[in-house]
Amino acid sequence: KPQDFKTGEETFASRVANGTGPYTLVKREAEVVSVLRKYPGWWGMREGRFEGNVDEMVYRPIKSDATRMAALASSELDLVLDPPLQDIPRLQADPKMKVVQGAENRVLFLVLDQERDELKYSNVKGRNPLKDLRVRQAIYQAIDIQAIQKQVMRGLSRPTGAMIPTERVSYPELEPRALPFGVAAAKRKLAEAGYPNGFQLRIECPNNRYVNDERICIAIAGMLAKVGIDMKVNAMPRAQFFQKVDNFDLSMHLYGWGGSAVDPGFTLTPVIHSRDGKGRGDFNSGRYRDEALDRLVEQAEVEMDVPRRCAIMLEAFRRVRDNFYFLPLHRQVIPWAMRSKVTVVHRADNTIEPLWVRLD
């Protein structure tokens, strides 16, 4: 039967390794500790693929920021994958510590309900303002992403106008913001759309999924207030948040997409395509429908000529950008904090590769 991620269900493979990897599982207590030990019989050992010198890896989830950083300071831990942003300057100034950082593949963006005829959690009755391109543009232009980068993210973000990491797929023309920040321009677009005094709506945000996720939403709410949009922030733990997303119980929400796969198809098919009940568009929670865009995505799925496929995908992303179906914000710059003796390779999927870890 399918694995139930929402209840934390583990599969047989979670605890019983198949014996072909560089490490074997010695111990696992869910949400407590996992211990991996170097496997001398791994086939890559003979080919020199084991470049690190760590024989045993111990993973300890520690929810409290203070406890986690105290464990690093006392050498109880050698490396922390998610140090609090406010601690980064102090860690960088400490000769006993080291900070390695890089931009994630994941893009954070706003999703707007473009399916309902009447917007939920709003004072607008009988219509949905988010279906109007001018309203979506107004919201986009009201957001000062540079201020979010500086004040909320403490410099650890990379603003983007794209739904994908552009440097990894050679689409640099998508990187700049689609429209410049401008309060006056945003107000004009709202007035043109029939909302000269703005309107009310609500944004759903996780408070423990992305870096400073709740603070991002609060900052955006303050920015939208300047153009007349009264936006309430409804922040919650990610388990509750994703349940609301699954049930479409929202009108606007913060979301992130990315991972180890860098091919644009892994964004186009599940996120950009409309929901067809067959797997495409399963994560298109804004539920817009654009038949021309769907055709481009479907063409890209089967096109074998690489230059032609790249051109099709670029056209699809341009259409998303021009219609403001999503409102891209930034990519997180993820810092890893460690003892100075540790050497690692930072990965854009925010995953540590034990094979490359060295202790000097």
Task: Label the model's feature ranges.
Residues 19, 150-153, 192-208, 252-257, ...:
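Bilobed periplasmic-binding protein-like "clamshell/Venus-flytrap" ligand-binding domains
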Residues 1-20, 44-54, 91-102, 107, ...:
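Short, solvent-exposed loop/beta-turn-alpha elements that line the ligand-binding surface or hinge
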Residues 22-24, 141, 158-192, 209-215:
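Structural transition elements
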Residues 87, 124-168, 212-216, 320-325:
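Periplasmic-binding protein-like
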Residues 11-14, 41-90, 133, 230-232:
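Ligand-site clamp/hinge motif
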Residues 78, 96-99, 216, 222-276, ...:
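Periplasmic binding protein-like
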Residues 26-37, 60-122:
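Extracellular/periplasmic solute-recognition and catalytic clefts
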Residues 21-24, 34-35, 54-61, 108, ...:
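Short, well-ordered beta-strand elements
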